[in-house]
Amino acid sequence: APICQLYWDAVNFRPTANSPYAYQTAKHPFNVGYDLNHSTTQTQYYTKRTLKYLLEEYNIDGFRFDLSKGITQNDYGTDVTAWGRYDAWRINRLDDYHKHIQSISPGAFTILEHFADVDEEKELGNRGMMMWGNAVYQATEAAMGFVNTSDFGWGVDYIKRGMPGNSVIAYASSHDEERMGYKCKMFGNAF
């Protein structure tokens, strides 16, 4: 990424230790590419300026932050359980970005692919952000004709999840999940 190459360790092929934009190594599991350091004012400025540009130049109606749980300064290493626990710093950083978005385009959506503890997701929902709700399993079961295992409650029903209203965006297909069409063809009882 060009922003990482501004402070680049060519020998180790990673950002330098003094980079104000990126960590040398990711602070969490499931990282893809380089991990931006959202605790620095430089990265916060860069992120907010990018959000502003996209809102004003392209008149988009909001953002979906992929792997939003990765916006953290805590070093979780490979501990997925610890990474998913309540993180007040992460909540406040995401809230700051959300407020920035709202200051430019009131009503714009902030959708988070978050998958953290329910308490953290509830707090983010109470602050006006929406959580990506995984309903892939249920949708695939329904598409395959297995009605008894296709309860959409958790992925779709914000009340069942204990979330504030309008804070869950369910999805039935994703680049991170098994292909629904393949499973329907190979295992479905509807064909």
Regions found by a protein language model. Give the residues of each.
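Solvent-exposed, flexible loop/coil residues
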Residues: 11-12, 40, 136, 148-150, ...
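Generic secondary-structure boundary/loop-capping signal
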Residues: 18, 33-35, 121, 129, ...
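Active-site-proximal helices and loops of the catalytic beta/alpha 8
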Residues: 67-172
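Loop/helix patches that line or flank the sugar-binding groove of alpha-linked glycan CAZymes
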Residues: 162-191
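Substrate-binding/active-site clefts of carbohydrate-active enzymes
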Residues: 1-59, 64-85, 97-103
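Short, solvent-exposed loop/turn segments at the edges of secondary structure
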Residues: 29-31, 58-60, 127, 131, ...
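Conserved protein kinase catalytic core
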Residues: 3, 72-73, 119, 179-182
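Short conserved micro-motifs at the rims of enzyme active sites and ligand-binding pockets
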Residues: 51, 122-123, 181-185
